[in-house]
Curated annotation (Swiss-Prot):
Catalytic activity annotation: aldehydo-D-ribose 5-phosphate + D-glyceraldehyde 3-phosphate + L-glutamine = pyridoxal 5'-phosphate + L-glutamate + phosphate + 3 H2O + H(+); L-glutamine + H2O = L-glutamate + NH4(+)
Protein name: Pyridoxal 5'-phosphate synthase subunit PdxT
Gene Ontology biological process terms, A to Z: glutamine catabolic process; pyridoxal phosphate biosynthetic process; pyridoxine metabolic process
Assembly and oligomerization: In the presence of PdxS, forms a dodecamer of heterodimers. Only shows activity in the heterodimer.
Length: 189
C-alpha cells in the first residue's frame, strides 16, 4: 500500500490523514526524521508556518524534508505548507524549505476573522469547481520558469506545481472533495 507521510507537528495533519485514507493510501504521521524512510510522498499541512518551521528545526526535520523533496519525491504543501515550500517569503526571514521557485505573501487574504470559502476553478481537476477554504491564506506573488500556475482567485495565484511539488493556499483537507489529493498522489511513480 502507498505510504504517504504527513508532517504532524502542528496544523491540520489529521484532516490530511483522513483524505489520504479516503484516496486508498496509508497516512504516516511524521514527527521524527526516521519516519520518512518508507514514505513515497509527503504532505506539509496548513497551520502556522512560523511555528511549523521552528518545530521542524527543533525535531531535526528541516534537512531530511528538504532532501526528500530535492530527491524528486512528491511533496504537497497547503497554506502554511505553501509558505514553507517557497524559496522566498515577502518581508520575512522565517525558516523555510526553499524547494519551490516561488515567492509568497503570508496572510494575503487577511487575518483569521477574514477567513472565507470560495469556488475555485482548477482546470487539471475538471470542470467542476473546487471548494477553497481560505484561513489566513498566503498567495504566490512570483513564479520561476519551471513553475506551472494551476489556479488563481481574484487575480492572486493560489495553486502551483513544480515537477513533483504542489503548493496550495487553501485547505482541501477541510472539504469532502478528494480530487486535489488524488491529483497529488498521481505524482508517485
Amino acid at each position: 500500500m502507498l505510504k504517504v507521510g504527513i508532517l504532524a507537528l502542528q496544523g491540520a495533519f489529521l484532516e490530511h490523514a483522513r483524505a489520504v485514507e479516503a484516496c486508498g493510501a496509508l497516512p504516516v504521521e511524521i514527527r521524527k526524521p526516521g519516519q520518512l524512510g518508507d514514505c513515497r510522498a509527503l504532505i506539509i499541512p496548513g497551520g502556522e508556518s512560523t511555528a511549523i518551521g521552528k518545530l521542524m528545526a527543533a525535531f531535526d526535520l528541516l534537512e531530511p524534508v528538504r532532501r526528500f523533496g530535492a530527491e524528486g519525491r512528491p511533496v504537497f504543501g497547503t497554506c502554511a505548507g505553501m509558505v514553507l515550500l517557497a524559496k522566498d517569503i515577502e518581508d520575512s526571514e522565517q525558516t523555510r524549505l526553499g524547494l519551490m521557485d516561488i515567492t509568497v505573501r503570508r496572510n494575503a487574504f487577511g487575518r483569521q476573522v477574514d477567513s472565507f470559502e470560495a469556488k475555485i476553478h482548477v482546470p487539471v481537476l475538471g470542470d467542476e469547481p473546487v471548494r477553497g477554504v481560505f484561513i489566513r491564506a498566503p498567495h504566490v506573488t512570483a513564479v520561476g520558469p519551471g513553475v506551472e500556475i494551476l489556479a488563481a482567485f481574484e487575480e492572486k495565484i493560489i495553486l502551483v506545481r513544480q515537477d513533483r511539488l504542489l503548493a496550495g493556499a487553501f485547505h482541501p483537507e477541510l472539504t469532502a472533495d478528494m480530487r486535489l489529493h488524488r491529483y497529488f498522489l498521481d505524482f508517485v511513480d
